[in-house]
UniProtKB/Swiss-Prot annotation:
Pfam families: VP5
Keywords attached to this entry: Capsid protein, Outer capsid protein, Virion
Top-level taxonomy: Viruses, Riboviria, Orthornavirae, Duplornaviricota, Resentoviricetes
Main location: virion
Record's compositionally biased regions (Polar residues): 431-442
Protein name per its UniProtKB record: Putative structural protein VP5
Entry's localization field: Virion
Gene Ontology cellular-component annotations: viral outer capsid
Top-level lineage group: Viruses
Region: Disordered, residue numbers: 418-448
Amino acid sequence: MLQQPAGGYTTLEQFTFTIRNDGTNATPTQFLQLLSYEATENELVKKAIPTPETHLPSARNVPGNVYIEDAITQALFGISAQNVNAHGYFSRLSALALPNTSARLGLDGVIYNNETVGIPFYDPVAVAKFATTYAKLGNASTPRYRADMIDIYAHVGLELAGTDAERAAGVMPVKRAKFDSWEGSLISLSRDVVYWKNLAFLIDLCSLEGDALNTFKTRNRDAFRMMLFIMSTAVAANVVNRKVTKRVDRVIEYIGSNSMRTAGRTATITYDLSRHEFAAKFLQLTFTKWNATQATTRSMPDMRTPRTSVTSAGESALVRHNRYMTESFKGLSPIALAQKKHEMMLHTHEIHSMDIDGSIKNMVERETVNKMNEIDAMNTMSWKEEIHAVEQTTVHGTHQMSADPEQTQLISQETAVITHRASSDADENEYGNSVSEMTIGTHSDDIL
């Protein structure tokens, strides 16, 4: 809000959020309509955002004036690196939250130590509410107050790519975003958003209440989503260009799934821990305010992967799979274990041929491979040792034959049966060994 004798102006009337395209101004809504989303097999589950701390960092005495708006927007939307020491400048916002403070926040985004003639300032009361929330950006790298980007970033994915039903449930497939037919690059888009009056947006978000806040959020929701989109491409997502004939499609991989979570990613020069922490803290504070009162949202198309229903045959197959997974194989002979492995492998192939959801197939495949690895790890004697034990039993039975002709005949028959079983087991065990050798090196991609 602007400090004016006749009353303050809000961002609803005073500012507009535009992007340059083909030499003209476009709105965030026009850009967001160019985005299409493709669901992947993975699933995104929203977790509750931790309540922000009440602690405000101590306001640092910075000589001169601080261009705070540029510091915030460059860290969120720009392409430059962010040094961890820069977090200290955000602590300066605490001075704006103090009662009877002489500090003022100018419309130009600068924190002035004193009110200056000729410079328009935001309303100090509204600024104090803003500063009480966003001065906590100075806590971004403090371990006690650090926010978890991996969990919080899921909210970005749901707000950008989720349908109404998915946002309500807090669950959606991880999606890729694609956009084309745009004159500029992602760098030019981020530059446009950097020059928005983002502080005015945040001040209104923190100071407006009731119907005025709902009106603000409804009218500016696409501007907020545009900020989240640019933040995704600048901080937490992989962006690739795919050439389709003469057209180049820009694809943002895995909206809502933070690509910086991997250990390999943290070892590269593109990983910026300080900026990562700052973005996480900003999202924690902003989503807490944004979600406090639900704004009216326009209905979005359902972009989820179609889910096929599981047939009765599929249900029977899954019941059988669960039986394999819960069955205890301890005490079984190596021959019997090889048979079980072969049965499970054939059963997995059967499930993969069914018209059921891919995530179920992947689950069956993963659990089957793990169960096979458990079988291989069992400390059982080799099949040769088992055959030797059978032969020893046969010899022992021969020496114990009675002189009674009838008993001798019975023992001879039993011996013949045992010998026949041993021979059959040997043949079957060779097959069992071939199954074992085939499945020992099985990985999740090999069973498909």
